[in-house]
Curated annotation (Swiss-Prot):
The UniProt record lists the keyword Nuclease: no
Annotated Gene Ontology cellular component terms: cytosol
Pfam hit, one: TK
Annotated localization: Cytoplasm
Protein name: Thymidine kinase
UniProt source species: Porphyromonas gingivalis (strain ATCC BAA-308 / W83)
Amino acid sequence: MDYEIENNHADSIRRGSIEVICGSMFSGKTEELLRRLRRAKIARQTVEIFKPTIDIRYDETDVVSHDKNAIASTPVDNSANILLLSSQVDVVGIDEAQFFDEGLVEVAQQLADQGVRVVIAGLDMDFRRQPFGPMPGLCAIADSVTKVHAVCVECGRLASYSFRRVQGDQQVMLGELNEYSPLCRTCYRKCSSPPQTEEIHSTI
């Protein structure tokens, strides 16, 4: 259920809030973000949507889910630009928040204090299972946090982790199912362990 009822235009006072949708890759974060933003538009609220310029996997400008559902957005280089471009709106949506700078936390706080409903989606952990970008800070200040899960491709259980199947130590590497797989804790540990080699003892 959404944190805030969307069709609240009858209220004379705008009530700001911060909603965070987080989880692993392929967990439906963007899909849930799009659902909430579409409902806000149906309620005749003014909506502005942003994504980092680095995210060009499906489209250079639109926010696109893995299911290929899309909504028009504005790509921005840094979080400060979101403040500059968010005047006179009721709802601000932000996708792939993990790729933004740490200033996004303060940007979200300022927007909510101004009465804007801020809906944010992003990876909470990187491929090493470490906190990713500004997501920990955003979860800390959020009025609501929705943790969504993918399905583990190895065993079918709920998956919380994004396992990288290609070589590379850099934290940011855009990819799809060929490069990343959603895994549960047990399967992540199994896939992360170095392969066991049989010890061969020579006999005389």
